[in-house]
Design a protein with these regions (language model features):
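Glycan-recognition and catalytic cores of secretory/periplasmic carbohydrate-active enzymes
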Residues: 1-335
Length: 335
């Protein structure tokens, strides 16, 4: 059906409408960047405040592609804010990205992210408070357990902000982020997961393609270096790095997503050794995961411990299907 122009236009409208509402809605952290795991209401305004690495990497890539097509400044800002959050809050000293941030801090869900009106009054000027009252629901009732989770209201999502309004929003973001960084942060799961880092490396490479921000490229390369140094041993990948040790045999997603990330990085700067590594990873993936009798790829390697069933993932769920990404990268490599 997508061969018909009107169907392509409809599909693109559905895509952009969804991503625009996500950008302004409560599922996106308006103050500090990064997307929460899911929403708890049908308007996508009040999230469960956990943030997952595997959500933000692919969303970063998706918004980068959307900006490349539309040149809409909103999407450029989402890309920048999400990448900044990844570098500020998720990148570990050794270079990899942490797996997730908890929803709770000090035992209270959302405490790090929500505001009392008196706190906002003390931090913002009159014009900024008026902006939040008009565009972010501050003039109404508190929307989360007696506090405000700030997001742009549904009516404003259909309109474009003026340059003056955008400047006001940016000032609000800077002031509230500075204040929020003084709070007790949510707990961080500091495991480095190969597959999740690979998704994020791809997203950061796509963001660099759009923004040409060298810090973003360096961040992606630091994560890749950790994987190469700590999780690639004796020609095989480990799935997890924690407390200085790589462990667990790599799964299909680790190989397929990492090859995909390498190919994305190679689009923005060329390194022959990384292409060679991608080919090497592809050879291991074929050797260790391919079902030579029935086709497709198993999630676990042939030398993995015996399981009652060896799954094959063909449908996208919380993350892309390993078989789909494996097929794509093998085609790109010419297999």
């Amino acid at each position: 059906e997508l061969q018909q122009p009107e169907h392509r236009q409809r599909a693109f409208f559905m895509l952009e409408n969804t991503l625009r509402h996500m950008a302004f809605g409560g599922i996106n952290d308006l103050i500090g960047g990064g997307f929460y795991r899911y929403s708890t209401d049908d308007q996508w305004m009040i999230p469960h405040f956990e943030k997952m690495l595997y959500d933000n990497g692919p969303l970063l890539a998706l918004y980068s592609d959307l900006y490349s097509y539309t040149k809409n400044a909103l999407y450029r800002r989402v890309i920048s804010e999400t990448a900044d959050w990844l570098m500020r809050d998720m990148q570990l000293p050794e270079g990899g990205y942490a797996a997730s941030l908890d929803a709770d801090s000090e035992g209270v869900e959302g405490l790090y992210y929500t505001w009392q009106k008196e706190q906002l009054d003390a931090l913002l000027d009159t014009d900024e408070m008026a902006f939040l009252s008009e565009h972010a629901g501050l003039g109404g009732q508190a929307n989360f357990e007696g506090q405000w989770h700030l997001h742009i209201n549904a009516m404003q999502q259909q309109q474009e902000f003026s340059q003056q309004q955008l400047a006001c929003l940016e000032s609000i973001q800077q002031k509230l982020l500075h204040a929020r960084l003084q709070r007790t942060p949510p707990g961080r799961d500091e495991k480095v997961l190969t597959a999740w880092n690979a998704l994020t490396i791809k997203g950061m490479a796509a963001a660099y393609r759009v923004l040409q921000n060298e810090d973003i490229l360096a961040s992606a390369e630091n994560s890749l270096a950790l994987i190469r140094d700590k999780l690639w041993q004796d020609g095989r990948l480990h799935a997890v790095y924690q407390l200085g040790v790589g462990r667990l045999n790599g799964y299909l997603d680790d190989y397929a997503f990492l090859i995909d990330a390498l190919l994305e990085l190679l689009q923005v700067r060329w390194r022959s050794e990384e292409l060679q590594w991608a080919v090497q990873l592809a050879e291991v993936m074929l050797e260790q995961f391919e079902d030579r009798d029935n086709g497709g790829f198993f999630f676990t390697s042939h030398d993995h411990e015996d399981l009652l069933q060896r799954p094959k993932a063909f449908s996208d769920e919380a993350m892309p299907a390993g078989n789909g990404i494996a097929t794509q990268v093998l085609l790109r490599l010419g297999y």
